[in-house]
A protein has these predicted regions:
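Active-site environment of divalent metal-dependent phosphoester hydrolases
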Residues: 25-38, 62, 76-79, 99-104, ...
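Divalent metal-coordination and catalytic microenvironments
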Residues: 8, 26, 67-69, 97, ...
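Short, conserved loop/helix-junction motifs that constitute active-site signature segments
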Residues: 13-17, 85-88, 117-122, 142-145, ...
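Core catalytic region of metal-dependent phosphoesterases/phosphodiesterases
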Residues: 1-60, 119, 123
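Conserved beta-sheet core of the metallophosphoesterase superfamily
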Residues: 106-178
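Active-site-proximal segments of metal-dependent phosphoesterases and phosphodiesterases across multiple
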Residues: 5, 76-79, 86-124, 135
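Active-site-proximal beta-strand elements of phosphoester/diester hydrolases
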Residues: 66-75, 92-99, 149-152
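Accessory, non-catalytic peripheral segments of nucleic-acid enzymes
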Residues: 174-259
Length: 259
């Protein structure tokens, strides 16, 4: 869409103006059912023609400064993935956008995949995209040649299916094979409040200032719901009530995100 092109162009340019920026393709950047179609990133990158913007589109080995990057691209298949033993370099970093076996969703479901952690042995760091929940699947172990494997998660909350917090960037310490999570402040979001027995949860007021509000109610009357809404709207007048559910049980996504 025109909006997508505009936003991505500004994002890539602004990042590249600050620091060398490396991007790889994700499943939403192309049509995996028709591999002859052009991905949406290529024309944007070519049009920007920014000297600090690098698009590692295809599976391969990319030497950048003193780091050896290896890409497993979204068009490739597991049997063709480059193994660490076939790559030379003091620091080997694998970039992959896809599901790794036993990675978790925001609801706590473990996902199956043909891509196993063992297939990444020998790399030093593995930087992942695709799964929106921030998580570290494995810590670095130099003795057993196990890389640190991490999903940095979505940049900001995308919908009600994601926790309000736990979004941002991972700042990597290449030398120590470690990272620091940097939370990106966001005034907008999708807030969910669980009303049980007519009571607000203790931490109900840690909501984004703006965005959409969803109430999930259990054992709660209409009168109690109206009272709760009045309290919430008084503190967060810019939140828009969009959904109301009556449920038998609730799952706290922000608590799940901490696991």
């Amino acid at each position: 869409s025109p909006e997508l092109i505009d936003q991505l162009s500004r994002l890539f340019k602004n990042l590249s103006d600050i620091v060398p920026t490396i991007i790889i393709a994700g499943n939403h950047d192309c049509n995996l059912n028709n591999l002859s179609r052009l991905d949406c990133l290529t024309p944007i990158v070519e049009n920007l023609n920014h000297p600090n913007l690098y698009y590692f589109k295809d599976s391969g080995v990319y030497n950048f400064a003193d780091i050896t990057f290896v890409v497993w691209d979204v068009w490739d298949t597991e049997e063709n993935y480059i193994q660490a033993k076939d790559v030379e370099g003091d620091t080997k970093v694998l970039l992959y956008h896809g599901t790794v076996d036993q990675s978790a969703t925001d609801l706590g479901f473990k996902l199956p995949s043909k891509v196993k952690l063992e297939s990444m042995d020998g790399y030093d760091m593995v930087m992942l995209g695709d799964i929106h929940k921030m998580q570290t699947l494995q810590k670095y172990d130099s003795v057993d040649k196990k890389p640190i494997v991490r999903y940095c998660g979505s940049l900001v909350q995308q919908n009600y299916g994601e926790a309000v917090y736990g979004h941002g960037a991972s700042v990597w310490d290449v030398k120590n094979r470690s990272f620091e999570h940097i939370e990106i402040p966001n005034d907008f979001g999708y807030a969910t409040i669980d009303i049980i027995d007519g009571n607000l949860p203790v931490d109900w007021d840690t909501l984004p200032e703006k965005g959409r509000l969803r109430l999930r109610c259990k054992n709660t009357t209409e009168t109690q719901i109206k009272k709760v809404l009045s309290i919430v709207k008084d503190k967060y007048p810019k939140l828009t009530e969009s959904k109301l559910y009556k449920v038998d049980s609730v799952i706290n996504l922000d608590e799940e995100a901490k696991k």
